[in-house]
Amino acid sequence: MLQNIRIVLVETSHTGNMGSVARAMKTMGLTNLWLVNPLVKPDSQAIALAAGASDVIGNAQIVDTLDEALAGCSLVVGTSARSRTLPWPMLDPRECGLKSVAEAANTPVALVFGRERVGLTNDELQKCHYHVAIAANPEYSSLNLAMAVQVIAYEVRMAWLATQENGDAADHEEMPYPLVDDLERFYGHLEQTLLSTGFIRENHPGQVMNKLRRLFTRARPESQELNILRGILASIEQQNKGK
């Protein structure tokens, strides 16, 4: 189950942080590390700071885009320390651990951490089902990357241990939620339909798509429900072609 949980680092700029993150992961039983467009490649410093978790570094998946790192996942949680202009469904670390473990019983889950200095962009955060914030001391809330990973990884492990003790891991119903790939295709289909009907304009889309993403993220449609929505969009397109 824990192998289904990906720790995704976006554009990491210090190899030492990669090693420290690998160490934080392995102490909690997590080994699935993804590096999105790292500004530096793992080196001897990363191995040194991994302190026995060099296998996590050696097996890390290095990809060019966040979409590649999220492919095949049914749940994506992004870390965010800042209040956003467009509020998003929020979790605390404990809720994040519980949700991640529940879903990882069936499909991959991605926990996404941003750049050391500026975190994740708004566009990247909008690819997430939830945002997670760590309730640090407001007078000094500066956690480095490995610290943030350690906090979330600890809560994941606590949630996983609870399932082992309660015997909940033996029998899980298949999760009905669509994968991130399917959701992105739906959003593309929705945007194209709204453009073709004139509801939004290509050069001036405003916040419509962002707000619709938030709406569907909050509602979190199941796979069958998403198929119904795609069918509705296809029907609208067919009607437009007949005019």
Swiss-Prot record:
CDD domains: SpoU-like_TrmJ. SUPFAM superfamilies: alpha/beta knot (SSF75217). One of its GO terms (cellular component) is cytosol. GO terms for molecular function: RNA binding; tRNA (cytidine(32)/uridine(32)-2'-O)-methyltransferase activity. The keyword Methyltransferase applies. It comes from the Bacteria. One of its GO terms (biological process) is tRNA nucleoside ribose methylation. S-adenosyl-L-methionine binds at T79, S80, A81, G114, I134, S141, S142, L143. It catalyses: cytidine(32) in tRNA + S-adenosyl-L-methionine = 2'-O-methylcytidine(32) in tRNA + S-adenosyl-L-homocysteine + H(+); uridine(32) in tRNA + S-adenosyl-L-methionine = 2'-O-methyluridine(32) in tRNA + S-adenosyl-L-homocysteine + H(+). InterPro entries: Alpha/beta_knot_MTases, RNA_MeTrfase_TrmJ/LasT, SpoU_MeTrfase, tRNA_m1G_MTases_N. Pfam families: SpoU_methylase (PF00588). Keywords: Cytoplasm, Methyltransferase, S-adenosyl-L-methionine, Transferase, tRNA processing. Its main location: cytoplasm. The keyword Disulfide bond does not apply. It is an enzyme of class 2 (transferase). Its EC number is 2.1.1.200. It is found in: Cytoplasm. Catalyzes the formation of 2'O-methylated cytidine (Cm32) or 2'O-methylated uridine (Um32) at position 32 in tRNA. Homodimer. Belongs to the class IV-like SAM-binding methyltransferase superfamily. RNA methyltransferase TrmH family. NCBIfam families: PRK15114.1, rRNA_methyl_1. This is tRNA (cytidine/uridine-2'-O-)-methyltransferase TrmJ. The gene is trmJ.
